[in-house]
């Protein structure tokens, strides 16, 4: 007889899957940034290693204006391929309190 998997177990398994997927995502984003002369910056639960079963991946994109759209598209696709929900913002749009809040936890991928 199959063991019944509880909701808490399913949530824990999904959180772990997301944590592992973020590790793979880091490699892909770093490789892209190095090849295209920009950088991605992770923050939030993905940067802290505290992904939950429903966490998204917070990414700042810091590329030249001519490369920004392609870098953004790459980050989106890379997240979707790993069944992660991206929350992407251009680094240039980060101002004031938001920047102050996320700066301590930023992980630069370049």
What residue ranges belong to the model's regions?
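Short, flexible active-site-adjacent loop segments at beta-strand->alpha-helix junctions, enriched
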Residues: 46, 94-95, 106
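Active-site nucleotide-donor binding segment shared across nucleotidyl transfer reactions
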Residues: 26-57, 63
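Conserved NTP/Mg2+-binding pocket subregion across the NTase superfamily
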Residues: 3, 98-110
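Helical scaffold of the NTase/Pol beta-like nucleotidyltransferase catalytic core
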Residues: 1-41, 77
């Amino acid at each position: 007889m199959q063991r019944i998997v509880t909701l808490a177990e399913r949530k824990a398994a999904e959180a772990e899957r997301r944590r592992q997927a973020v590790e793979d995502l880091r490699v892909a984003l770093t490789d892209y940034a190095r090849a295209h002369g920009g950088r991605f910056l992770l923050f939030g639960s993905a940067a802290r290693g505290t992904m939950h079963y429903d966490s998204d991946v917070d990414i700042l994109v810091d590329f030249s204006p001519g490369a920004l759209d392609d870098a953004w598209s790459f980050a989106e696709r890379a997240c979707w391929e790993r069944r992660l929900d991206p929350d992407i913002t251009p680094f240039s749009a980060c101002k004031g309190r938001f920047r102050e809040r996320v700066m301590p936890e930023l992980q630069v991928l370049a």
